[in-house]
């Protein structure tokens, strides 16, 4: 039986006799020596991850101006920071987007620009007080001008993350990257074998006060992260570190098309091998870490699981999905994760980094709750018009014109002989056909690619689809494509009027 203490390991770090390996190397060591042998041989295992961590931000202090100002609103390079703190304290979120450049530039870019030594435009406003009389401030600053610049990240270093795919017929732009139609690709995130929390799944050595590698400098875990869900192996960490000591090699801003900005963070955690149980945990392989592939075509919180896979399958470059070979790609960098684990290994090996035990362990049970919503989410069936005029595809344009005139309705659902939706015809389509002397069947002038929605779909999703494609109405259909009604922009406008 092997038992060590952190004090004993730190003495070895101090005298240079410590044996430190990466989590990737530990797999082979346990295979060759067994768990007990590995626990005797190895003192520290280093881990690493480098990925998009949206829930990150910078806590900063600007120092007092002359005359002084109690900042109410604050912008850095036209990116707004939260300033509802003391006079010149502020928090800049990585995902906050620019007022002028939109999602191409955001809080993450401001943070990286600061780290790279660039000068920032600062604009601040206030209501003015006797002790803080100034109302407007414009200046330029660099990182060196700030009293404090503490990277304070509410949720980083997920233990693992669900992969993503897309069953719809169009490209989806998401925080999981670009998802191609018809299950065209799978994207995933996480370092697998090098993942810090996957190498200590019971959080024996990782918790409040643990010293870590953060953005190229030493940082600390200050507790579990938001949405910490240990019961489903989706643990998270809340971290802090001094931005002034970090490196842009391990902190990079990014913008995801159609989604927004994020901050790529490099995190590494050393795990002291105190006993055989911890040694066994640090021998986890990609094959041992499973996650679900979710369908992002469903615009709902609870997305359907398409398949369960392990990280070895994801990292192989392709998996079988819906009967075909589907490419996989990572949004995080395993190359950088490996680089972090190796750099941390060198720090420990050369006495530049000492391991520490948490003053309080992370919770091992529990899961994140969904938002409490006091107002029912309106569904399409709640606002749709259940009276809809239909026409057969083999009827004439004159028949269609007569139906629109008799019913004062601008949209006709075109159905087959068995009642399935096959197209849609509008008053504009009929006017165009008449102008071009086309009096053939409805099928020759109808729109065949019809946007539709389901009765139990949230109205918000239907409204987004109407707006995206610039149409004013969509037929509501069941699973057999039978027409149940129609939802129009007018229906949605009336709903909003009732809400507000």
From Swiss-Prot:
Pfam families, sorted: CBS, HcyBio
Protein name: L-aspartate semialdehyde sulfurtransferase
Positions annotated as active site in the UniProt record: 131 (cysteine persulfide intermediate)
Keyword ATP-binding: no
Subunit structure: Forms homodimers. May form a complex with MA_1822.
GO terms for MF: transferase activity
UniProt similarity note: Belongs to the L-aspartate semialdehyde sulfurtransferase family.
Function according to Swiss-Prot or TrEMBL: Required for O-acetylhomoserine sulfhydrylase (OAHS)-independent homocysteine (Hcy) biosynthesis. Together with MA_1822, catalyzes the condensation of sulfide with aspartate semialdehyde to generate homocysteine. Likely functions through persulfide intermediate.
Stretch forming the signal peptide: none
């Amino acid at each position: 039986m092997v038992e060590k203490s952190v004090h004993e390991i730190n003495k070895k770090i101090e005298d240079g006799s410590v044996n430190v390996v990466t989590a990737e190397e530990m797999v082979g060591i346990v295979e060759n020596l067994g768990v007990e042998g590995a626990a005797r041989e190895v003192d520290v295992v280093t881990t690493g991850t480098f990925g998009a961590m949206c829930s990150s931000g910078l806590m900063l202090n600007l120092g007092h101006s002359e005359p002084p100002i109690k900042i109410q609103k604050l912008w850095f390079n036209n990116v707004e920071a939260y300033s509802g703190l003391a006079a010149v304290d502020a928090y800049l979120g990585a995902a906050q987007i620019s007022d002028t450049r939109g999602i191409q530039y955001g809080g993450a870019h401001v943070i990286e620009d600061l780290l790279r030594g660039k000068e920032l435009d600062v604009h601040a406003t206030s209501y003015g007080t006797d002790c803080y009389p100034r109302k407007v401030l414009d200046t330029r600053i660099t990182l060196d001008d700030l009293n404090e610049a503490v990277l304070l990240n509410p949720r980083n270093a997920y233990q693992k993350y669900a992969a993503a795919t897309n069953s719809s017929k169009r490209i989806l732009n998401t925080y999981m990257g670009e998802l191609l139609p018809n299950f065209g690709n799978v994207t995933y995130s996480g370092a697998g074998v090098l993942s810090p929390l996957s190498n200590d799944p019971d959080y024996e050595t990782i918790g409040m006060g643990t010293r870590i590698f953060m953005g190229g400098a030493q940082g600390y875990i200050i507790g579990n992260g938001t949405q910490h869900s240990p019961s489903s192996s989706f643990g998270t960490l809340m971290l802090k570190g001094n931005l002034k000591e970090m490196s842009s090699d391990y902190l990079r801003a990014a913008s995801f098309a159609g989604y927004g900005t994020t901050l790529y963070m490099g995190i590494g955690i050393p795990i002291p091998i105190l006993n055989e149980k911890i040694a066994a945990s640090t021998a986890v392989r990609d094959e041992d870490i499973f996650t679900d592939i979710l369908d992002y075509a469903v615009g709902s919180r609870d997305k359907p699981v398409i398949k369960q896979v392990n990280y070895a399958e994801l990292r192989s470059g392709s998996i079988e999905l819906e009967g075909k070979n589907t490419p996989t790609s990572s949004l995080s960098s395993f190359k950088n994760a490996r680089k972090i684990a190796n750099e941390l290994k060198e720090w420990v090996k050369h006495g530049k980094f000492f391991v520490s035990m948490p003053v309080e362990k992370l919770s091992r049970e529990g899961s994140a709750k969904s938002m409490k919503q006091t107002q029912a989410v309106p569904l399409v069936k709640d606002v749709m018009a259940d009276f809809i005029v239909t026409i057969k595809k083999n009827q004439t344009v004159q028949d269609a014109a007569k139906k629109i005139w008799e019913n004062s309705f601008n949209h006709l659902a075109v159905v087959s002989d068995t009642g399935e939706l096959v197209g849609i015809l509008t008053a504009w389509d009929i006017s165009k056909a008449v102008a071009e002397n086309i009096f053939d069947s409805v099928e020759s002038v109808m729109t065949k690619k019809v946007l539709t929605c389901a009765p139990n779909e949230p109205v918000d999703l239907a409204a987004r689809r109407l707006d995206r494609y610039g149409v004013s109405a969509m037929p509501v259909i069941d699973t057999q494509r039978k027409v149940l009604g129609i939802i129009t922009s007018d229906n949605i406008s009336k709903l909003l009027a009732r809400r507000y």
